[in-house]
């Protein structure tokens, strides 16, 4: 395409295949327009004016706005062809722009005749559009193949023509990656998508058909196009009808039953869809299923079976294959089909699907079947789509589609059709692959099915390699592969896969994703959004749904990609079904996101109409023929479920329209609402059913429900409508059943996607997208509706600024956030997410823009495309265009450094573009080769590669999404990303964006984007920053003024790429922020101020990637780090060394994170990821350091560029940090509002000059590397004041600022959560807004670097934390190696801060007042933060006269302790004024080191006195003072708490004995009292020398100890549980005293034992019976009278600890004859042993006497009254002393 549209800047993307090239100009333009949006970043920059003009031209007027919206939607979403697309086209040439604008504008139906003409002119491509199953897909496809130069080389449509096998995937991917993977993948994506949408498995044939006739593809688009091109509703409708009939014929041949059924059902596409979903309509699809899945009993039965039959089957299947499927009425059929697929899928790649698990098969089945169901849905859809699209693909597509669903061969198509790939994140890939498989359909199809089933790398390799082998290598391939790979390999990491799929789908769906995701509900940009919308929440879900399904898939992905996929398909299917059932309406709604689509849909009223509108929007420039085809198809689909569809559609429309309305489609809404009025009645019944099912789904999705609160009705309507469409009756029955089954099976088949769908929330949290689960289930129904509504509302809102959208956005925001990783692809979803969604959309735009970043203008264009992708098309589009204008990458943006950053942005943008349906061909172009290699390298890589490749942007995005679940993938991606980075500037941008989008997705994006995206991000970011500055401001204002999507969308559009990029990231977890920051980084010099928000977003998103890296390992948590990495890499320029690049990127991203947070006011939540990253960085300091060293060794070149500076920084400190900071400071300053709050420890950087920015990033890394040096470095930074010495504390600071954002991410890391949360309170207040804004850069950099090593899991956690705003700390902790984080401590006892007396300090250790410790005043804040977060705090110093002994922090048993060192400082003169006393407790002396811990509160002096005096207190044996004696004492009283251990400090037993003692009293506290040692040595039989007991007993300390002892005994007498409670709480007031007394008693008792040689029975009796009676009587022996003595022991046995009488039957009294001379010794021994019990009894008596005098007294009062009886206490003390003295005398 570039070749064809070189002037537009499409030159960047590889020229489309000849077929594409040869496609009519209009279609090419249409596609190009779309693709450029997604993949023509360069085009954007190159033809920025044109793009901007065309975009703005479109934007100014409502119709234009609508068009733009559509375009935006298309470009952004599955509307790659949306405004951006047209503009991209326009950018290519004004004629193209006009054409495109004209093309998309007609979608609104308000386009000027010329536009319409132009649009109609592309009616040929309309066929093409139809050929591309989804309108968007078609559009994309058209754009790609026919009108998108970007798609040219790999245009799936084109390639479908030329190479059905490979191209289909590419095509589908093209649809997906049309924006993202425009060059290679887009075509494939597009076509594939359309093929997938209509007949996923037939994609290849479809493709081949599409290129030539676009018949099959056209057919699907017909529905879509109908929806898409409502303006030409009548003609298009007629055309569609004709095409439908044609398609019917075409389809029948391939899949007679399925197609016929499809057509029949297709006639009611929604009906069919509903049927599929309901099983009733799925009959035909089922039949198809049968055909395809004859082996699959369920499918066959379903298809052949009647609805009832199908329902049971569905139930079974659902239960078995798609509990997820159940959620939506469409799901049942899906499930059913899934089963078919399952059986079938296993055929092709039984192993893989099976490995995937039951779920995989289920998923596969789900996919296949959901496909099938979707297929049916798609059948219905495909009939809507297929019908439209199937003309070419028709027989094959439909056939295959259904074949996949039903026939074995069809699986591909089924995937395609079902849009498994789209629906199922995995499936999308798989599906795409399947579609791709068109040529090698059976295997590929199976593979894809399998792939999705296996959902994992197996499939990836199988599908990706087989289906996608070339394509995987190929950009399109990669796109698919990645999508697929992502979906699949990330199927491994369900999130990854799902996300990838979704990403891919979302992106591809966005690009191709609309088609794919939609059915791919997202394949149609409109479709996907529509689907999303259509799915209601589902529509949102589509994007969300796609993302959501993706999410579902993604989240379930961990369980099973299949599961996730299934869930997605379920979600998707329901979404798709609903969507399709609502058919194109949902799509149109999606399309509607741009007003034109909804409008056109409303106009058409038909889902297909909506679809057409959507489709039209998607590739408005496609031939009107295609549109007409769509119209025909549309009419066909309308016809099929016309009543149902209409009713459902209306209902759907109503809810959707409202959503759309709020989002961006005002007129559409009106039409939709009008229709809804009529349809609502029809659908009311169904709606009720739908509502019921939706309720179920809502219940399942839970989260989404809230989001649907305002739009719940709408959502329910939407859901109902789609589902009603599915099968009004069957739907009612089956949907309910499905839902029930879905719910039941979701739980049952947690593995399965449905489960994923329902439970996706859980997986999502891993992804940091708790909403993903919602999106699936909830999205399906509630979320789907809500999301859809939200999306629409957000988009409409963005355009219309409706409050409703904001509500929806807010409500959906949670769901959306979860969905966001996928949603990030779907701008509408992002918008649904409110600000975040919008921003995510914008990041998508950004991605798209960046996609073409190789040509600075291209990113703009893509961004623009994405902007349209953002649901708020009218305003957003405008803003986006403005943004684009600004974004038109300035020279500065293209600076090498910036460029690297932009490279990252490009990656992200590319991914976003792909997600948005923008062709990523630009990106793909530059990054295709490397990307392909990378993709081949790994799934994550694959994703990354996709991201890198313009066509793979979607993949990248997908991969990111997918990689979220796969930390490994991320690393691979990172490495690949590095390569790519070098090779592709723009690709990296795409990747970056993708990554940013996926930071939530996590790893893949983290790693890959980190590498390649870096450069791209640099460019795109700068450009975006420049262009987005005003918008950013506007965004900020808007966001602040409105939380709705409109503002978010506007912002996003304003920021376009970055914003969109940000949106995606943000949506996911905070990636948005990262993305923005990323961009900010890029625009440090040129566009810092321009796009501060975006920068911030990028930064935040970057932190997210770091999290993703961590999460990848852990759970697809953070893409932030990797996002950061890409930037870093970008900065480091394209280092060949992937690892080094990764590190660089990580560092860079960390820096970016820090930097970006400054400007992320709107995206405050995303700062948290940054913080998290920072934290993680700290956690992984050592690992990072090691890694850096390794990198240096392995890749000496690494020392060049960013890494070199970073390494230097690590060596010299944070000087460099300031440069990075400086660049970002403006952004931060601008965004300081909210961003400031989120800013973390790095704020000082903000203060630093721009020159410090790069260093600051490196500084961040260095922080992570050298905690101490870093701490000092940070000290220099004002923002790191509290944690100057501790990078951890710095991270903590950052966390403080980003605590809310991090909290969102917290879900994944509970461990860290605690610490982080603890740290958060301190840190949040700590960093100043702006200062923090800057400082985070360094901190983030550190976190990023470390993340590269360890943060993957943490990153994932961070992502999740991003979702839950309170877990920043947790993430932070997670980011640090567990061994580097200690248990958090909320407060620190520092003189002047916590000097309250009479407060127990609690905790282990002995407070010794004589020990004076101090801490530097300047370190106090850092110290507090570090302790709070568990990070390494500054050292403390022990005052030793004129010297200070240094105590350094250590972690022992998870506790932060300080160990003595041999370092000393002088402590005299002025030095004394620089320190504050800090209260510590002595733990123990071990290894010749003294260990202390810092008190949280100032301890009372009493314990310390006791402890001090105990050594000197006389033991009854006079041994107490001796350490051994005290040790013995402790041992003797096991009841005494282990705290006694702390007493051990003064005297340690010999090493061997000490070890034994330690084991024995490991739990006891090591106090420096000899008692403990006494106790210990007692156990060892060590008898210490007897001290003079009298001497001790007479001391005041001894009296205090005894008094405390008595106080405790009185308490125990009142409450036997007191002792246990005190031991649990490590009481430090009373327990030490009791232990001391017990130790003394044990010590003396042992000394007596030495003199008493007791028999064991006698000894046992002495110790068992508390009462002893001496019996002496004279024996009357003949010899004279000799005294005979006996000792009688009796009494009740008691518990030695609680002193309660034992309930066990006590032995009868025992008598022992003893030596009269030793009776006194026995008595003494007995008294010592039972002394506590005896005193306890005395206390009980005293208590009873007190209670008699004073009734109604509480325990405290009684204890106080007893203790006030001084005489009583002193008498007991005297008796105690006498006892000990007596023992001493006897033993001496």
UniProtKB/Swiss-Prot annotation:
Keyword field: Chromosome, Isopeptide bond, Phosphoprotein, Ubl conjugation
Region (Disordered): 1-69, 472-498, 532-617, 1104-1163, 1234-1264, 1494-1588
Biased composition (Polar residues): 60-69, 478-492, 532-569, 576-594
Modified-residue entries (Phosphothreonine), positions: 1003, 1394
Position(s), cross-link Glycyl lysine isopeptide (Lys-Gly) (interchain with G-Cter in SUMO2): 1112, 1137
Cellular component per GO, a single term: chromosome
Entry annotated with the keyword Ribonucleoprotein: no
UniProt biased composition (Basic and acidic residues): 1126-1136, 1545-1561
List of residues that carry Phosphoserine: 670, 940, 1041, 1262, 1281-1282, 1401
Protein name: Glutamine and serine-rich protein 1
């Amino acid at each position: 395409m570039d070749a064809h549209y070189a002037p537009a800047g499409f030159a960047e993307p590889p020229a489309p295949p000849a077929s594409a090239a040869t496609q009519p100009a209009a279609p090419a333009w249409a596609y190009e327009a779309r693709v450029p949006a997604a993949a023509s970043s360069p085009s954007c920059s190159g033809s920025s004016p044109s793009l901007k003009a065309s975009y703005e031209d479109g934007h100014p007027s409502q119709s234009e706005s609508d068009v733009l919206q559509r375009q935006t939607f298309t470009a952004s979403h599955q509307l790659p062809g949306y405004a951006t697309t047209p503009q991209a086209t326009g950018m290519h040439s004004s004629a193209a722009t006009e054409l495109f604008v004209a093309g998309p504008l007609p979608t609104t139906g308000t386009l000027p005749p010329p536009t319409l003409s132009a649009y109609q002119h592309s009616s040929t491509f309309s066929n093409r559009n139809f050929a591309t199953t989804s309108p968007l897909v078609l559009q994309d496809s058209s754009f790609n193949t026919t009108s998108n130069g970007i798609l040219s080389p790999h245009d799936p449509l084109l390639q479908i023509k030329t190479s059905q096998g490979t191209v289909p995937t590419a095509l589908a991917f093209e649809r997906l990656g049309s924006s993202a993977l425009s060059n290679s993948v887009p075509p494939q994506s597009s076509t594939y998508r359309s093929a997938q949408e209509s007949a996923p498995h037939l994609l290849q044939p479809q493709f081949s058909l599409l290129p030539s006739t676009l018949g099959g593809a056209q057919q699907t688009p017909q529905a879509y196009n109908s929806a898409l091109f409502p303006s030409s509703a009548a003609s298009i409708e007629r055309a569609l009808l004709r095409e439908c009939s044609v398609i019917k014929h075409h389809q029948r041949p391939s899949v007679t039953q399925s197609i016929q059924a499809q057509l029949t059902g297709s006639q009611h596409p929604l009906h069919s869809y509903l049927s599929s979903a309901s099983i009733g309509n799925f009959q035909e699809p089922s039949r198809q299923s049968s055909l395809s899945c004859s082996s699959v009993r369920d499918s066959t039965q379903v298809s052949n079976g009647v609805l009832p039959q199908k329902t049971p089957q569905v139930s079974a299947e659902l239960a078995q294959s798609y509990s997820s499927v159940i959620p939506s009425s469409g799901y049942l059929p899906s499930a059913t089909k899934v089963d078919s697929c399952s059986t079938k899928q296993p055929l092709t790649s039984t192993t893989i699907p099976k490995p995937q698990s039951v779920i995989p098969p289920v998923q596969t089945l789900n996919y296949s079947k959901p496909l099938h169901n979707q297929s049916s849905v798609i059948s219905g859809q495909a009939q809507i789509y297929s019908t439209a699209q199937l003309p070419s693909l028709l027989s094959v597509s439909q056939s295959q589609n259904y074949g996949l669903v039903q026939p074995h061969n069809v699986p591909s198509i089924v995937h395609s059709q079902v849009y498994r790939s789209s629906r199922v994140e995995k499936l999308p890939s798989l599906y795409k692959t399947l579609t791709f498989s068109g040529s090698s359909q059976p295997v590929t199809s199976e593979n894809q099915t399998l792939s999705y089933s296996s959902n994992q790398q197996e499939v990836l390799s199988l599908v990706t390699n087989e289906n996608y082998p070339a394509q995987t290598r190929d950009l399109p391939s990669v796109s698919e592969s990645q999508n697929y790979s992502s979906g699949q390999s990330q199927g491994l990491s369900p999130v990854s896969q799902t996300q990838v799929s979704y990403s891919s789908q979302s992106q591809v769906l966005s690009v191709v994703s609309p088609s794919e995701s939609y059915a791919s509900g997202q394949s149609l940009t409109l479709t996907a959004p529509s689907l999303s919308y259509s799915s209601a929440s589902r529509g949102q879900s589509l994007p969300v749904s796609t993302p959501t399904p993706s999410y579902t898939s993604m989240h379930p992905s961990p369980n099973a990609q299949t599961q996730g996929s299934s869930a997605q398909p379920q979600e998707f299917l329901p979404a798709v079904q609903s969507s399709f059932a609502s058919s194109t309406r949902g799509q149109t709604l999606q399309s509607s996101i741009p007003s034109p689509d909804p409008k056109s849909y409303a106009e058409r009223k038909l889902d297909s109409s909506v679809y057409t509108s959507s489709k039209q929007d998607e590739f408005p420039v496609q031939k009107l023929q295609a549109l007409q085809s769509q119209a025909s198809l549309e009419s066909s689909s309308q016809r099929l479920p016309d009543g149902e569809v209409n009713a459902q559609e209306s209902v759907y429309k109503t809810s959707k329209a409202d959503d759309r309305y709020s989002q961006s489609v005002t007129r559409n809404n009106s039409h939709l609402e009008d229709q809804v009025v009529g349809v609502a009645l029809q659908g009311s019944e169904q709606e009720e059913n739908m509502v019921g099912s939706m309720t179920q789904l809502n219940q399942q999705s839970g989260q989404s429900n809230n989001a649907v609160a305002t739009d719940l009705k709408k959502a329910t309507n939407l859901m109902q409508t789609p589902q009603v469409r599915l099968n009004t009756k069957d739907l009612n029955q089956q949907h309910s059943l499905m839902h029930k089954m879905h719910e039941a099976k979701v739980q049952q088949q947690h593995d399965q996607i449905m489960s994923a769908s329902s439970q996706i929330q859980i997986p999502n949290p891993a992804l940091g997208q708790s909403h993903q689960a919602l999106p699936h289930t909830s999205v399906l129904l509630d979320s789907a509706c809500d999301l859809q509504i939200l999306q629409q509302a957000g988009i409409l809102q963005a355009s219309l600024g409706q409050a409703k959208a904001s509500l929806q956005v807010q409500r959906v925001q949670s769901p959306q956030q979860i969905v966001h990783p996928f949603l990030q692809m779907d701008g509408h979803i992002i918008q649904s997410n409110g600000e975040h969604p919008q921003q995510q959309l914008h990041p998508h735009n950004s991605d798209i823009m960046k996609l073409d970043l190789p040509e600075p203008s291209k990113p703009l264009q893509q961004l623009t495309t994405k902007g349209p992708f953002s649901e708020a098309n009218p305003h957003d589009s405008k803003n986006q265009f403005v943004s684009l204008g600004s974004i038109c990458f300035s020279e500065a943006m293209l600076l090498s450094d910036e460029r690297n950053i932009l490279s990252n942005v490009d990656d992200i943008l590319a991914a976003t573009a792909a997600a948005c349906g923008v062709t990523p061909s630009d990106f793909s172009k530059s990054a295709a080769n490397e990307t392909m290699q990378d993709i081949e390298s790994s799934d994550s890589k694959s994703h990354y590669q996709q991201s890198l490749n313009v066509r793979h942007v979607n993949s990248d995005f997908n991969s990111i999404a997918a990689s979220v679940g796969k930390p490994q993938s991320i690393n691979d991606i990172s490495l690949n990303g590095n390569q790519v980075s070098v090779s592709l500037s723009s690709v990296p941008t795409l990747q970056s964006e993708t990554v940013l989008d996926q930071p939530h997705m996590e790893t893949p994006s983290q790693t890959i984007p980190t590498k390649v995206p870096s450069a791209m991000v640099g460019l795109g970011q700068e450009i975006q920053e420049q262009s987005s500055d005003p918008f950013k401001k506007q965004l900020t204002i808007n966001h602040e003024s409105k939380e709705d999507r409109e503002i978010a969308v506007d912002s996003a559009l304003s920021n376009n790429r970055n914003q969109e990029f940000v949106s995606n990231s943000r949506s996911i977890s905070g990636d948005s922020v990262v993305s923005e920051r990323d961009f900010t980084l890029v625009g440090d010099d040129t566009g810092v101020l321009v796009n501060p928000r975006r920068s911030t977003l990028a930064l935040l998103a970057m932190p997210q990637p770091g999290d993703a890296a961590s999460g990848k390992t852990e759970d697809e948590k953070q893409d932030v780090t990797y996002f950061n990495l890409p930037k870093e890499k970008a900065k480091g320029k394209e280092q060949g060394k992937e690892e080094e690049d990764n590190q660089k990127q990580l560092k860079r991203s960390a820096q970016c994170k820090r930097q970006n947070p400054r400007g992320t006011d709107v995206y405050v939540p995303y700062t948290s990821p940054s913080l998290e990253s920072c934290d993680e960085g700290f956690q992984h300091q050592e690992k990072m350091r090691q890694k850096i060293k390794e990198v240096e060794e392995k890749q000496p070149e690494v020392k060049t560029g960013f890494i070199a500076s970073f390494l230097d920084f690590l060596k010299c400190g944070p000087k460099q940090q300031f440069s990075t900071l400086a660049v970002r400071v403006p952004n931060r300053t601008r965004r300081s509002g909210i961003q400031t709050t989120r800013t973390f420890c790095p704020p000082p950087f903000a203060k630093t000059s721009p020159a410090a920015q790069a260093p600051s990033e490196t500084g961040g890394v260095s922080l992570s590397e050298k905690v101490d040096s870093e701490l000092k470095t940070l000290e220099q930074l004002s923002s790191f004041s509290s944690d100057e010495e501790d990078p951890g504390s710095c991270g903590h600071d950052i966390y403080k600022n980003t605590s809310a954002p991090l909290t969102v991410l917290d879900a994944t890391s509970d461990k860290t959560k605690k610490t982080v949360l603890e740290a958060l309170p301190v840190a949040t207040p700590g960093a100043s807004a702006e200062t923090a804004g800057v400082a985070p850069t360094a901190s983030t950099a550190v976190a990023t670097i470390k993340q590269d090593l360890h943060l993957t899991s943490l990153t994932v956690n961070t992502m999740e934390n991003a979702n839950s705003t309170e877990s920043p700390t947790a993430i932070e902790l997670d980011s640090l190696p567990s061994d580097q984080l200690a248990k958090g401590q909320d407060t620190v006892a520092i003189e002047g801060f916590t000097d309250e007396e009479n407060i127990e300090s609690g905790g282990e250790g002995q407070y010794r007042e004589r020990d004076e410790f101090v801490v530097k005043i300047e370190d106090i804040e850092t110290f507090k933060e570090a302790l709070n977060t568990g990070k390494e705090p500054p050292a403390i110093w022990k005052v030793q006269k004129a010297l200070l002994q240094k105590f350094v922090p250590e972690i022992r048993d998870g506790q932060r302790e300080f160990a003595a060192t041999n370092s000393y400082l002088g402590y005299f003169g002025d030095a004394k004024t620089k320190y504050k006393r800090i209260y510590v407790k002595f733990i123990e002396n071990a290894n010749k080191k003294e260990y202390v811990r810092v008190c949280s509160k100032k301890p009372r002096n009493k314990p310390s006195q006791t402890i001090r005096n105990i050594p000197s207190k006389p033991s009854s044996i006079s041994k107490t003072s001796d350490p051994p004696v005290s040790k013995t004492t402790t041992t003797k009283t096991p009841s005494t708490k282990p705290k006694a251990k702390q007493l051990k400090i003064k005297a340690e037993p010999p090493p061997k004995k000490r070890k034994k003692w330690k084991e024995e009293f490991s739990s006891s506290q090591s106090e420096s009292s000899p008692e403990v040692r006494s106790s210990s040595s007692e156990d060892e039989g060590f008898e210490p020398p007897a001290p003079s007991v009298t001497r001790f007993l007479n001391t005041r300390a001894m009296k205090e100890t005894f008094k405390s002892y008595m106080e405790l005994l009185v308490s125990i007498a009142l409450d036997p549980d007191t002792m246990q409670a005190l031991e649990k709480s490590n009481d430090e007031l009373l327990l030490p005293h009791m232990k001391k007394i017990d130790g003394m008693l044990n010590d003396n008792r042992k000394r007596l034992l030495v003199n008493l040689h007791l028999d064991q029975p006698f000894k046992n009796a002495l110790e068992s019976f508390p009462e002893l009676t001496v019996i002496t009587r004279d024996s009357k022996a003949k010899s004279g009278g000799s005294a005979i003595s006996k000792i009688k022991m009796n009494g009740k046995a008691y518990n030695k600890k609680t002193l309660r009488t034992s309930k066990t039957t006590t032995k009868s009294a025992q008598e022992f004859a003893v030596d009269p001379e030793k009776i006194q010794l026995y008595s003494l021994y007995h008294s010592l042993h039972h002394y506590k019990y005896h005193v306890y009894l005395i206390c009980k008596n005293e208590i009873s006497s007190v209670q008699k005098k004073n009734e109604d007294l509480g325990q405290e009062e009684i204890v106080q009254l007893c203790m006030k009886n001084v005489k009583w206490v002193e008498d007991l003390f005297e008796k105690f002393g006498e006892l000990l003295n007596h023992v001493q005398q006897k033993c001496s």
